[in-house]
Every structure is written in structure tokens, then in C-alpha cells.
Amino acid sequence: MLQPVFWLIVGMILLIIFMTDLLYGVIPLSVNLLFFSLVLLYRVILVAFGQMTVADLWLSALSAFGLSMFFIFLQKITKFIKKVDGLGDGDIALSPALGLLLGWPKIAVGIFMAFVIGSIVGIALIGFSKKKFNQTIPFGPFLVIGAVIALVWGGSIWSWYIGMLQ
């Protein structure tokens, strides 16, 4: 009974994040905190009822931390090189919830998909003169799209990719 309610709320939060970042260029910290708290509570409940191992919870927590550090690094390096923020604070604040929600290796699939889709859309917008090269494009919608792809097909995509490496 808990899972459908959880996924419905997650879907609504992801839709709010998608639309607010797309329309206003911001992801409210309150929404990110609510999202993270909800995912953390859900994961702890899964562990308490034996539907998730403590090791998997730790791996998800490490995914959350690792993604956050990666995004902070990207923001700092683009600030140093280009003198602009490459990622907004809302994107960075969203990363722990996504890492905890997806865990490893789905988070890798989700972030890869977000960057690929975001790059394609960005190039298309510049190509069709809808945006200039120095204008920002909200990244939150692409993080949401990447997360949804990872939730639905992340395991299959990861298995396919690993199979290609062997």
C-alpha cells in the first residue's frame, strides 16, 4: 500500500521540479528538502520491513553524496574557467534526493541521460536561434527526465552497457 502512494508523491514532486525550473529557472529549496526527506524516510522504512538491505541503503547514500560532490565540482570548475555557474544551486540541492532515490548504478544512467538529452536540446535551441550560446538553460528538467528513464529502464540500460564492455 505504501509504494503506490510514495511513487505518486514522487511523480508529483518531479513534475513540480520540472515545471518550476523550466518556467522560472529555479528549483525551490523547500521542494528539494521535502523530496530528500520523503525518499530518505521511504528507504528507511524499506530497510525496517526487510524490503531493502542496509548495504543497499548505504550504497544509495553514497550515490547521493557522490553525485552532490560531482555537481559541486562542476559548478566550481565552470565558475573558475568561465566565471559563471555551470549548475545552479537548485540542481546541486536536487542531487542528494536523486542519488538516494536511484542508487547505484541507476544514478549513473540517469545523470548520463540528463547530460545527453540536455546537450541535444541545448544544441538544437542554439541551432534554431531560440537561445544564444551564453544563455543558460535550466538543467532540472533534464535531471528529471534522466531520473525517470533510469527508474524505468536503468537496470536494462546498465546491463546492456556493461555487456558492451565485455
Model-predicted regions and their roles:
Residues L40-R43, V148-V152:
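Aromatic-anchored segments of alpha-helical transmembrane domains
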Residues D89-G90, G127-I149:
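Interfacial loop-to-transmembrane junctions
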Residues V44, I72, I123-G127, G155:
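Membrane-embedded alpha-helical segments of multi-pass transporters/permeases
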Residues V116-K130:
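Transmembrane alpha-helical segments of integral membrane proteins
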Residues P4-F6, M12-I17, L23-I117, W160, ...:
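Functional transmembrane core segments of multi-pass inner-membrane proteins
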Residues M1:
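Cys/His-rich short segments
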Residues G110, I126-N134, S156-L165:
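Extracellular/periplasmic helix-loop-helix junctions in multi-pass membrane proteins
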